[in-house]
């Protein structure tokens, strides 16, 4: 596990000398695995901290997760920041599901803590946010995006590196993570909402993917990941093409305005027109 994750991090240049890493620690198996693995890889390549977000839902179960995170970090000598959010109120105020509201608030906390820590580091050092998504999550995400009608960017799946966010466990699967924890006699918390059929992702995980494996192709998950990788390459190429076309064709640029000739835009294939528009909006 350690070598696999270390090699994957190096392949995708997730950290550089002098960088620091914040682990998003929920207390579940995936984030516990991520923290324990990175703890063993941390010195001297990067400094390590953890952040646990209490979402203000799940009552005693959430309190249990917080206490577990504190105990785990104490045992590993990893500094821990606990942040408290009231997800139901935020969800109601912004017309969001609690799942989406929790995700937004969680990332806000992580980005804030990363920014604060970065100010304490030497110039040029960055703070990365390590998230515990793994191979199974990626396959589920690709399938979910397909069923929602996503474009190539969504169908490419979860990116290993996205700004300061890194995902060192995308090279391993759920079963590998559980096996690693059990072999090391490392405990974790179970989130009861992960079993709820109310969430689409849970239904994909517990019903749709198993059905595809048994009724269509036992290698369905692997093939979904392979397709996502190919689509990701196509997406990256189209982004690059849009950037090159833009740089060649742009004819006017002001502080809040840039333009390319309509003729240059019109002669592009439809898919590149879409990518050009996205590039302009970015």
What are these regions (language model features)?
Residues 17, 253-282:
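Mid-to-C-terminal catalytic/tRNA-binding core of tRNA(Ile)-lysidine synthase
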Residues 138, 223, 241, 272-276:
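Residue-level detector of well-ordered alpha-helical segments, enriched
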Residues 166-257, 264:
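Contiguous mid-protein beta-loop-alpha structural module that forms a pocket-lining wall or clamp
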């Amino acid at each position: 596990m350690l070598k696999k994750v270390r090699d994957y991090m190096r392949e995708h240049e997730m950290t550089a000398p002098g960088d620091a890493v914040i682990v998003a620690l929920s207390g579940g198996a995936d984030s516990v695995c991520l923290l324990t693995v990175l703890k063993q890889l941390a010195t001297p390549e990067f400094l390590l901290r953890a952040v646990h977000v209490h979402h203000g839902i799940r009552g005693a179960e959430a309190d249990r997760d917080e206490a577990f995170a504190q105990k785990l970090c104490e045992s590993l000598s990893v500094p821990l920041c606990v942040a408290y959010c009231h997800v139901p109120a935020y969800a109601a105020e912004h017309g969001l599901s609690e799942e989406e509201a929790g995700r937004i608030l969680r990332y806000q906390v992580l980005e804030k803590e990363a920014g604060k820590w970065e100010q304490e580091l030497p110039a040029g050092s960055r703070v990365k946010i390590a998230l515990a998504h793994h191979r199974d999550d990626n396959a589920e995400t690709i399938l979910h995006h397909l069923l929602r009608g996503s474009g190539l960017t969504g169908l490419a799946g979860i990116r290993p590196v996205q700004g300061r966010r890194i995902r060192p466990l995308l090279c391993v699967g759920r079963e590998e993570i559980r096996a690693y924890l059990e072999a090391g006699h490392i405990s974790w918390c179970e989130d009861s909402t992960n079993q709820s059929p109310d969430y689409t992702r849970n239904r994909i995980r517990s019903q749709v993917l198993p059905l595809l494996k048994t009724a269509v192709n036992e290698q369905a998950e692997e093939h979904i990941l392979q397709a996502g990788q190919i689509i990701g390459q196509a997406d990256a190429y189209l982004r690059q093409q849009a950037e090159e076309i833009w740089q060649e064709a742009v004819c006017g640029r002001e502080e809040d305005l840039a333009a390319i000739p309509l003729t240059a835009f019109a002669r592009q294939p439809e898919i590149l027109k879409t990518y050009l528009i996205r590039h302009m909006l970015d």
